[in-house]
UniProtKB/Swiss-Prot annotation:
Record-listed O-(pantetheine 4'-phosphoryl)serine modification sites: 635
Pathway: Secondary metabolite biosynthesis
Native organism taxonomy: Eukaryota, Fungi, Dikarya, Basidiomycota, Agaricomycotina
Positions of the Carrier domain: 598-676
Family: Belongs to the ATP-dependent AMP-binding enzyme family.
GO molecular function term, any single one: acid-thiol ligase activity
Biological process per Gene Ontology, one example term: biosynthetic process
Organism per entry: Paxillus involutus
Stored PANTHER family: LONG-CHAIN-FATTY-ACID--COA LIGASE, NONRIBOSOMAL PEPTIDE SYNTHASE PES1 (EUROFUNG)-RELATED
Protein name per its UniProtKB record: Atromentin synthetase invA1
Alphabetized UniProt keyword annotations: Phosphopantetheine, Phosphoprotein, Transferase
Region annotated Adenylation (A) domain, chain positions: 59-466
Amino acid sequence: MSPVATTTSVTPDVISSLKTSFSAGQTSYIPSTLFDVLSYAAERYPSHELGFITSSAHDSSIQTKTFSLFNAQVRNLGRALLDLNKPAGSIIVVYLTEHEDNMAAVWACLLAGYVPCLQPALSAQQAHKEGHVAHIKNLFGSATWLTNEAGAEQVSSIAGLEIHLLSELKIAAEGYSVSADWTARTVQPDDEAILFLTSGSTGFSKAVVHTHRTILAACYAKGEAYGLTSESNILNWVGFDHVAGSLEMHIAPLLYGASQLHVHASAILSDPLRFLQLIDEKSINVAFAPNFLLAKLTRDLEKKTELFGSFDLSSVTRINSGGEAVVSKTAKAFVATLKNLSRDPSKVSFVISPGFGMTETCAGCIYNPADVSTSEPNYEFLELGTPITGCEMRIVNPEDGVTPRVDGESGELQVRGPMVFSRYYNNAEATASSFVEGGWYRTGDVGIVENGVMRLSGRIKETVIVHGVSYGIPELETYLQTVEGVTHSFLAAAPYRAPGQETEGFIIFYAPTFDLYGEDASSKLFATHRALRDISVKMITLPPQHIVPIPVNQMEKTTLGKLSRARLTGLFKQGELAKHIARAEELLSEARGASFVTPQTETEQTLAAIYAGIFNLEVADVSATDNFFELGGTSIDVIRLKREGEAAFDLPEIPTIQILKHPVVSSLANYIVALKTKGVNAEEYDPIVPLQLTGKKTPIFMVHPGVGEVLIFVNLAKYFQNERPFYALRARGFEPGQPFFTSMDEMVSCYAAAVKRTQAHGPYAIAGYSYGGVVAFEVAKRLEAMGEEVKFTGLINIPPHIADRMHEIDWTGGMLNLSYFLGLVSKQDANDLAPSMRPLTRKEQLEIVWKLSPPERLVELQLTPEKLDHWVDIAGSLIECGKEYNPGGSVSALDVFYAIPLRGSKEDWLNKQLKPWEEFSRGATSYTDVPGQHYTLMDFDHVPGFQKIFRSRLEARGL
């Protein structure tokens, strides 16, 4: 066996040779800077298009711009940027959501002579976000941000930032009309072009410097590898802040004159079928799909025979994949499924090309275009292949970083070539440690090269990858170490992928503080493992595959006092930890057995199977006593349970409220039996909806917003599992035969009595969202009048004086507000449609909203026009109750949480509208800024940050 040889020879003429290949089918004009790329594309292919589908749930249409129009717009935008009066070469942090906005901002910065730095989505955890922004500010020595209104709000609490809005810049750009080749300054190939931030999985982010030369070297080679031409059509849904989204799927195709369609990730992830529809509709040739999407598409579509033969997929020639390993059987199943879905399977011929790349290498630099339909993969995961032109790879001894490994032996993967980054910005130490002699970049990955083809076998770096996103293991371990039952410094989390598993997971190894053979070991182990799982889900959205307790005297540390993840994982794979795993399973079975009840009736068994399907459990592991929300159920899962239950039991409807009230298998089964056999009479109204019941701390009572419903709280309630019960209060009128409330006093009396029935005595913690805030305030007053202690009254984005606002809202306004809250219409539509709709009948107005509503959202909410009409009446009844509301009296203390208001500035909202709450509190009133806007502060993106802030205020009040 011979030492691993370099695969591609890098010479000073590599870019020239690529340019020669490029020019053979194009023109003698060869771009050498990014400026040239844009000019060339606009001049040579003026009518070719950039297409965009935004993140809006209300508009999935494709918006297009020709290369010529885009070129003109971004040059005017660049000219407007000059008015910032920044020195040439200044760094502008670009923090935007949509592809079109990001693309325009990056090109404008470049053309204005600035250096854009693309900022990924900021953390929802306030401390982490503030630490990152402060780090970026110090790293660049400046703090100029170009963002949108939502982005500005996210960083508004951080001092010292110079924030500019893209919307204002666009308005300023309308005053300019520069030439089609305008630039503010001349640049050279080795000048800084774009900065990309690393994931920060092992600490604060580093800023990767890519020059015009490194980007063009990568893009020339990528285009050659993909077979791009000016007739190609590209589909991208990777975020523009990622090198794959901006360089691989935008600049590389632009260099070759290829048309592009950029889709916000949410549009694909919420409806994977859209991926195939777009391939068909736009004759896509090259697209990107990570392993988890390949697997999801296959699972969702392989059994949908009604869709077979529905799509024209003959255009697609290549699907790139990256971010995580591609499972060979998944790739084969995906290809087979696409052939079944195609109108003409014989014309479906494409490669799935897994690749290796990093931010430092301009994304993919090693590819394996595999036709899995004609050749059998050699391994469980598809190999990653060979380098693109200009790139070299080698495998070396990770200890010294230079000694080559022989063919077939694993070691550290290193790459070099003109597409490798030049340096980390303002971080000479990290740059130096990333390279070894000869310009080889140390990737931190462990690989094997056989016959010139590379595959990965592990990572040196301390991360775990979940759906292509890297999470830092040390940070996760820090939080896991805090769990009661874990011996301090004797816990390690290690990445792990089980044989046949589609995505990577991880294992937690730890030494328990208690004796595994002690009298109460089962209950202690159960509590410890439940807490470890809860923290893992909250931190990285994934529970551990295995949790292995090992007696402390059997957990060996290195001479430096550290646990070796590699050693522990090796012992696990070799079966050396089997006795500890068996003991843990025995104890957990004992603990679970104490409360486990085998589903007995056919209804219970059917529900157990539905629960198992939703949570990926074995049916035999679902107890009749299992609670839907304690298993991890979300608001989306509630809708799925509702749909599957209605289908399984042949019921026209299972009311959502009944699922919320009966989340336990046996309880829901009893309700369904009653519904099927004799129908369920309208039961006595009870506003209390128990969203989760575990934990010993003071319960939370959360009052509904102005729409009356409480599903908005389901995701928030999950964060209080094993800490404190979480009850929501739902308005009256949703169920048949229930009258609406007719006054605020009637509502408050009902809610206060319900709270007392649920928790007989204080101290109480009660809060309300929006309209529910004033109701919560009144309930707190009522409880105090009964002689009870209310230690926490939380008011979420609502002022004390609401009567004037209630009088402003007519039926049309209320209907549009509700429709926006439910995600049926956009905020702009809700604001703009009212004047033209008011002269119409109620039915006509509802028809307009119905036509604007995304069909998938209507299905998700199980809405009909009649149900929407009734819901508007419920919301209207609450508005009527608030029209005469005049706050008075006081409570012991108030905690006010404020977000971006529906109208006006946040500063005015706080100082003029919310500060008057001080008149109604006998103690100090706190005012806490929370992420998001009025209608989004508890959505999936913002609830992780909100719950942390909300919990901190509970703790501050001694709860």
